[in-house]
Amino acid sequence: AAVPSGASTGIYEALELRAVEHINKTIAPALVSKLAMQEFMILPVGASSFRIGAEVYHNLKDATNVGDEGGFAPNILENKEALELLKAGYTDQVVIGMDVAASEFYRFTASAGIQVVGDDLTVTNPKRAASEKSCNCLLLKVNQIGSVTESLQACKLAQSNGWGVMVSHRSGETEDTFIADLVVGLCTGQIKTGAPCRSERYNQILRIEEELGSKSFRNPLAK
């Protein structure tokens, strides 16, 4: 029930909402959006360069807010609306990645042709994740695992189970470019390092590509 917080019962009196029902039906809907996804990411799987990802990113220029990792944080309420924003005219070359933070998504690994990337699960207990087939790709965060040696071991464990490996930064970390060298050295073919405006790692990958020349990795799905 709505109970006046003081002696006055006037229309401007602040109300103290004591019942849990008010929290569930009044407060929560006003504060929490309907998005079930933490992040929507662009994966230019058919690209031969960074251009496609950058163009999709710039297609979102009307969004006003920018998140911690350089991604746009527009005021949207539904998942479908977020997916519509990511359209930029490419077909069969760009796919959408979603950070859903859902413990139930492991069921998809056996029934659907999608990549399910394990985050905290693979850091805390990678052997259990592999044995239970909870996911099919490792999100490799060096500063979360603890050391480069342990990161290499985790990568080998994942690959020995037929998993993919995605090298990743962590929110709030420095501009150090080491993970760009790591993703090339491990030949994982996947990196998660924020939006193009956070360009340090992308520039390092471009420098590596320039140095390697014809020996550099080429996306087999590029058109």
Swiss-Prot record:
Disulphide bridges, residue numbers: none
Chief place where the protein resides: cytoplasm
Keyword list, A-Z: Acetylation, Cell membrane, Cytoplasm, Glycolysis, Lyase, Magnesium, Membrane, Metal-binding, Phosphoprotein, Plasminogen activation, Repressor, Transcription, Transcription regulation, Ubl conjugation
Residues involved in Mg(2+) 2 binding: 99, 119
Chain positions found as Phosphotyrosine: 12
Residues that span the membrane, as ranges: none
Reaction catalyzed: (2R)-2-phosphoglycerate = phosphoenolpyruvate + H2O
Positions where N6-malonyllysine occurs in the chain: 87, 215
Region of interest (Required for interaction with PLG), ranges: 202-223
Amino-acid positions noted as binding Mg(2+) 1 in the UniProt annotation, renumbered to this chain: 8
SMART domains given in the database record: Enolase_C
SUPFAM superfamilies xrefs: Enolase C-terminal domain-like, Enolase N-terminal domain-like
PROSITE patterns xrefs: ENOLASE
Cofactor note: Binds two Mg(2+) per subunit. Required for catalysis and for stabilizing the dimer.
Residues annotated with N6-acetyllysine modification: 25, 61, 87, 133, 141, 215
Pathway: Carbohydrate degradation; glycolysis; pyruvate from D-glyceraldehyde 3-phosphate: step 4/5
Record PTM: ISGylated.
Gene Ontology CC: one annotated term: phosphopyruvate hydratase complex
Stored Pfam families: Enolase_C
UniProt: substrate binding residues: 39, 119, 168-171, 192
Residues annotated as the enzyme's active site: 69, 141
Family: Belongs to the enolase family.
Subunit comment: Mammalian enolase is composed of 3 isozyme subunits, alpha, beta and gamma, which can form homodimers or heterodimers which are cell-type and development-specific. ENO1 interacts with PLG in the neuronal plasma membrane and promotes its activation. The C-terminal lysine is required for this binding. Interacts with ENO4 and PGAM2. Interacts with CMTM6.
Protein name: Alpha-enolase
Organism: Mesocricetus auratus
Gene name per UniProt: ENO1
